[in-house]
């Protein structure tokens, strides 16, 4: 019965036990009601007391045999003995007192049954020392409840004998009154007691024999030890004492408990992973920076699930609260340049798509390259000495990068890897000069608007073709002259600086307000830095050598003073109006600018008749003093002829490095000079200003180089 609580209710199982209980309780009640009062008067008052004690003992043992756990073994879990369920043999043999005893595998309970254990087909459980299943108590009789069953049989037999005997005595005393009610009820109780006495007495005798011999009903019926010796017997007295006087066996099943539903209040709930600030320490080339980002529970899960090959998720937007001065500037640049970048810019190569720029200062945070360039460009005006300090550290090349210098933060303390031939894919990239009285600390990367898409695409194409290697990407810090510059008086900020992130319309409106006419000064003496061709491919080296040869062979322009050492400087200049300045960065300028060769105290002689006050700066060159950047119009991407009186210089565009698709984009992108129409860049000088050099009226000469490449040279 204890095992039936969780199973389907079967009324037929309770019929025998209910009948036994009714007969036991009903017959005894009638005996106490009609027979015991007369026996207490005629025989002894002890007769009702004896029968009452015997009845209670019978009822107690009956209840214990019915409701007590017989010794059920718990079933194994589904995956506990999975291998044994398929591969185990049907029997295993153990030795008990020198006798081999078989243990059978139970497929239902999924374990080997211990000795004297059997699976009950009614209860559907394996019971320790299984005796039999008794329907009168509706329970299996096993090791734990066999004692109470045996005592129930003994007490019931004695009780039946007492009821029958005392009822017969009452009838003998009232033999003249057999038709009376008391005598009739007593005779009915005697019939019931006599009817149950024979089977109960027989079953009791059988179990007395089994107990004396140390056997169970199952072993006796199946004949396990019929022809041999019982290894479980300890003699008659020991067997009886073991059944009646031994301590009860342990219970293997826990008592069934109802699951309680408990309402958990918030203090006991584990807090979910909410959006919060997570600080990550980043070690890169000896620079420690704190990266504060907001990560949610979903992003953490995605990061954990991603493999090492997967592309990292895009970094979050920069925290504008830390850069209060640039809020308005960034808002305008983002809103007005988003449409231009979406149309003209190619997709960023995967190689440097998500490269945050780390700052050497503790207050700067790591951000994506576009936003980092915007913020760091503004910070470089206020903190110019951070590059000077970081440039003295050795350059680490543990992680090569193809990102242009103009997209990097000026305070980033790593050496810049740049393509020396990327200038061939730009329209006006060979503009650079140096003024007097410059300072080493103020180094800025000023690029023209529109060079972003071309430099990205040229770098991506060269990387795919395998024509460049990471070691050939030289940096300004590699030059031996970089550290030989002496600090001069601190100059004012550049007057003609226009943010490359401003739209063309805003830049055009602000140009007239920012840049007044400047008085021309003498030029600066320059000496070329050695060009490094270490790890370039053969085609590129041959193209460069042929380009140098063509430049040497071309006749000098009238009115042009050729200084020694300037033949291969890679610097070209075209005239333009003073109110339309433009500066552009070039990889050639970054490697060819001799920072320590110009005397600081004397004025320089002008080159090409170009005022020094209208000079631009390269990537690796220090910031000029009171000069303002100046830029003319390139004639490589313009279809108009130069006006009379205006000189045009030679400019070689390395067109084989670009695909036709790139050229179309370049013509569209570079039709404006820093956000201004081409007409502004090609305007003739004022009437009071003499022409800077005599014009060159030659045509365009096409020269075929090594590898089938074709160059267009303006002669």
Curated annotation (Swiss-Prot):
Q: Which parts pass through the membrane?
A: 14-34, 39-59, 149-169, 192-212
This protein's GO cellular component annotations are: dendrite; GABA-ergic synapse; glutamatergic synapse; Golgi membrane; membrane; nucleoplasm; phagocytic vesicle; plasma membrane
What are the disulfide bonds?
none
| The entry's keywords | Acyltransferase, Cell membrane, Immunity, Innate immunity, Lipid transport, Lipoprotein, Membrane, Methylation, Palmitate, Phosphoprotein, Synapse, Transferase, Transmembrane, Transmembrane helix, Transport
Q: What's the top EC group for this one?
A: transferase
Q: What is this protein called?
A: Palmitoyltransferase ZDHHC5
Keyword set includes Magnesium: no
Q: Know anything about its domains from the record?
A: The DHHC domain is required for palmitoyltransferase activity.
Per the UniProt topology annotation, the Extracellular ranges are 35-38, 170-191
Classification from the root reads: Eukaryota, Metazoa, Chordata, Craniata, Vertebrata
Query: Which residues are annotated with the PTM Phosphotyrosine?
Result: 91, 533
- What is one process in the GO biological process aspect for this record? protein palmitoylation
The UniProt entry annotates the active site at 134
Q: Which residues carry this modification: Phosphoserine?
A: 247, 296, 299, 345, 380, 398, 406, 409, 415, 425, 429, 432, 529, 554, 621, 684, 694
């Amino acid at each position: 019965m204890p095992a039936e609580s969780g199973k389907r209710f079967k009324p037929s199982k309770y019929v025998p036990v209910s009948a036994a209980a009714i007969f036991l309780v009903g017959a005894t009640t009638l005996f106490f009601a009609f027979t015991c009062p007369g026996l207490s008067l005629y025989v002894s008052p002890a007769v009702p007391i004896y029968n009452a004690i015997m009845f209670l003992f019978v009822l107690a043992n009956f209840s214990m045999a019915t409701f007590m756990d017989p010794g059920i073994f718990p079933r194994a879990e589904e995956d506990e003995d999975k291998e044994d369920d398929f591969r185990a043999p049907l029997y295993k043999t153990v030795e008990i007192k020198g006798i081999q005893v078989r243990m059978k595998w139970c497929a239902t309970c999924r374990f080997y049954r211990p000795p004297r254990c059997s699976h009950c087909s009614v209860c559907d459980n394996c019971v320790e020392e299984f005796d039999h299943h008794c329907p009168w108590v509706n329970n299996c009789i096993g090791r734990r409840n066999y004692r109470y069953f045996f005592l129930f049989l003994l007490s019931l037999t004695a009780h039946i004998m007492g009821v029958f005997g005392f009822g017969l005595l009452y009838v003998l005393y009232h033999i003249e009154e057999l038709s009376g009610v008391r005598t009739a009820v007593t005779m009915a109780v005697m019939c019931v007691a006599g009817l149950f006495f024979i089977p109960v007495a027989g079953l009791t005798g059988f179990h007395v024999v089994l107990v004396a011999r140390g056997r169970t009903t199952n072993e006796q019926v199946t004949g396990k030890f019929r022809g041999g010796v019982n290894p479980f017997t300890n003699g008659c007295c020991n067997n009886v004492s073991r059944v009646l006087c031994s301590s009860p066996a342990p219970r293997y099943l826990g008592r069934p408990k109802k699951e309680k539903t408990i309402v958990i209040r918030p203090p006991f709930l584990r807090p979910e992973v909410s959006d919060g600030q997570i600080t990550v320490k980043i070690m890169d080339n000896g620079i420690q920076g704190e990266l504060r980002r907001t990560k949610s529970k979903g992003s953490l899960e995605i990061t954990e699930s991603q493999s090492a090959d997967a592309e990292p998720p895009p970094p979050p937007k920069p925290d504008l609260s830390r850069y209060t001065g640039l809020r308005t500037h960034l808002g305008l640049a983002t809103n007005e340049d988003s449409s231009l970048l979406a149309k003209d810019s190619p997709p960023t190569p995967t190689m440097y798509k998500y490269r945050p720029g780390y700052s050497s200062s503790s207050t700067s945070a790591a951000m994506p390259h576009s936003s980092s360039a915007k913020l760091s460009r503004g910070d470089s005006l206020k903190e110019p000495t951070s590059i000077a300090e970081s440039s003295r550290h050795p350059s680490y090349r543990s992680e090569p990068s193809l990102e242009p210098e103009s997209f990097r933060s000026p305070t980033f303390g790593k050496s810049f890897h740049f393509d020396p031939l990327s200038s061939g894919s730009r329209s006006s990239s060979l503009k650079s000069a140096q003024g007097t009285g410059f300072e080493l600390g103020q180094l800025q990367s000023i690029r023209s608007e529109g060079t972003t898409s071309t430099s990205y695409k040229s770098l991506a194409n060269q990387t795919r073709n395998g024509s460049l290697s990471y070691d050939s990407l030289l940096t300004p810090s590699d030059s031996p002259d970089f550290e030989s510059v002496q600090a001069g008086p601190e100059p004012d900020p550049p007057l003609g600086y226009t943010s490359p992130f401003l739209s063309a319309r805003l830049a055009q409106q602000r140009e007239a307000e920012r840049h007044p006419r400047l008085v021309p000064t003498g030029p600066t003496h320059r000496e070329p830095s050695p060009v490094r061709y270490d790890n370039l491919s053969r085609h590129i080296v041959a193209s460069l050598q042929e380009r140098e040869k063509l430049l040497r062979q071309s006749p000098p322009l009238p009115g042009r003073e050729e200084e020694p050492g300037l033949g291969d400087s890679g610097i070209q200049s075209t005239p333009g109006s003073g109110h339309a300045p433009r500066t552009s960065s070039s990889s050639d300028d970054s490697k060819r600018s001799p920072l320590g060769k110009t005397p600081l105290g004397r004025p320089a002689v002008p080159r090409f008749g170009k005022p020094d006050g209208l000079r631009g700066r390269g990537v690796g060159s220090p910031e000029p003093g009171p000069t303002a950047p100046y830029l003319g119009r390139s004639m490589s991407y313009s279809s108009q002829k130069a006006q009379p009186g205006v000189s045009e210089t030679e400019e070689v565009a390395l067109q084989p490095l670009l695909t036709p698709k790139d050229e179309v984009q370049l013509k569209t992108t570079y039709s404006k000079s820093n956000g201004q129409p081409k007409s502004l860049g090609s305007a003739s000088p004022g009437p009071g200003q003499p022409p800077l050099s005599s014009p060159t009226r030659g045509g365009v000469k096409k020269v075929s180089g090594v590898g089938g490449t074709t160059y267009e040279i303006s002669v």
